[in-house]
């Protein structure tokens, strides 16, 4: 079971990734974790990565693909894997295909932008305890105050509407074209199978739709 999970920030990919990896006994592979592990291991590739990261550069697709090919030969990938946050661009998707890495399923968690903005921009946090509220779905007893201490709640920089909209526009320009790429590939070659799942409703409902698409 080799899966790519796509979806905008705030679409609920992380939650679904957890259910998929548990259900099928496969690891979740994120490029960030993989790059950090390579640097820590000090392999020749890892040293290359460290050099690029130390100079503030972006790690090239060639290096990332080489790391992925290395990573998926490890024992925990025997039953497959789930890619999280990769590929992000068409060149990465093409490089993955050219490298002979076969993918069985591409799952897009599709959520409307306005729904994502409302989900994220409504979050309020109590910094000291990490308690999270939501102005609509889980409001504090007193607006703007933590239920336990009565201290002020804050809105994190990442949760502000303009930040969320900026991240969504980056997603639409960079990653959304992958949806078309995999839809066309699926139609032409029959693999990977492409599924668009509406990421609205309860977590259980969405999970049921995702797992049924994969089985």
Curated annotation (Swiss-Prot):
* Residues binding AMP: 31, 36, 57-59, 85-88, 92, 156, 167
Free-text note on domains in this protein's UniProt record: Consists of three domains, a large central CORE domain and two small peripheral domains, NMPbind and LID, which undergo movements during catalysis. The LID domain closes over the site of phosphoryl transfer upon ATP binding. Assembling and dissambling the active center during each catalytic cycle provides an effective means to prevent ATP hydrolysis.
**Annotated source species:** Pseudomonas paraeruginosa (strain DSM 24068 / PA7) (Pseudomonas aeruginosa (strain PA7))
Please report the name of this protein according to its UniProt entry: Adenylate kinase
What is the E.C. number? 2.7.4.3
Going by the UniProt record, its keywords in alphabetical order are: ATP-binding, Cytoplasm, Kinase, Nucleotide biosynthesis, Nucleotide-binding, Transferase
- CDD domains under this entry? ADK
**Major localization listed first in the record, in broad terms:** cytoplasm
Subunit relationships: Monomer.
> Which GO cellular component term is one of those annotated?
cytoplasm
One record GO biological process:
AMP salvage
**UniProt-annotated stretches for the region LID:** 122-159
Give yes or no: UniProt keyword Methyltransferase: no
Compartments, as annotated in UniProt: Cytoplasm
Q: Which reactions is this enzyme annotated as catalysing?
A: AMP + ATP = 2 ADP
The GO terms describing molecular function are: adenylate kinase activity; ATP binding
The UniProt family comment states: Belongs to the adenylate kinase family.
Entries under Gene3D superfamilies matching the protein: P-loop containing nucleotide triphosphate hydrolases (3.40.50.300)
**Where is the region NMP?**
30-59
Enumerate the HAMAP family for this protein.
Answer: Adenylate_kinase_Adk (MF_00235)
């Amino acid at each position: 079971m080799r899966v790519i999970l796509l979806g905008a920030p705030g679409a609920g990919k992380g939650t679904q990734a957890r259910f998929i990896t548990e259900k099928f006994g496969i690891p979740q592979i994120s490029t960030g974790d993989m790059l950090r592990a390579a640097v820590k291991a000090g392999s020749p590739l890892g040293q290359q990565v460290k050099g690029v990261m130390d100079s503030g550069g972006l790690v090239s697709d060639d290096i990332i693909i080489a790391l992925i090919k290395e990573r998926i030969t490890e024992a925990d990938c025997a039953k497959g894997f789930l890619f999280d946050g990769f590929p992000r661009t068409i060149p990465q998707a093409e490089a993955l295909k050219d490298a002979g890495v076969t993918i069985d399923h591409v799952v897009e968690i599709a959520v409307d932008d306005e729904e994502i903005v409302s989900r994220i921009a409504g979050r309020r946090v109590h910094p000291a305890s990490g308690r999270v509220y939501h102005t609509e779905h889980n409001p504090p007893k007193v607006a703007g105050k933590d239920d336990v201490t009565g201290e002020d709640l804050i809105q994190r920089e990442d949760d502000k509407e303009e930040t969320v909209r900026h991240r969504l526009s980056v997603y639409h320009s960079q990653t959304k074209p992958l949806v078309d790429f995999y839809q066309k590939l699926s139609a032409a070659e029959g693999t990977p199978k492409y599924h668009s799942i509406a990421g609205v409703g309860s977590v259980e409902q969405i999970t049921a739709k995702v797992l049924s698409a994969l089985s």
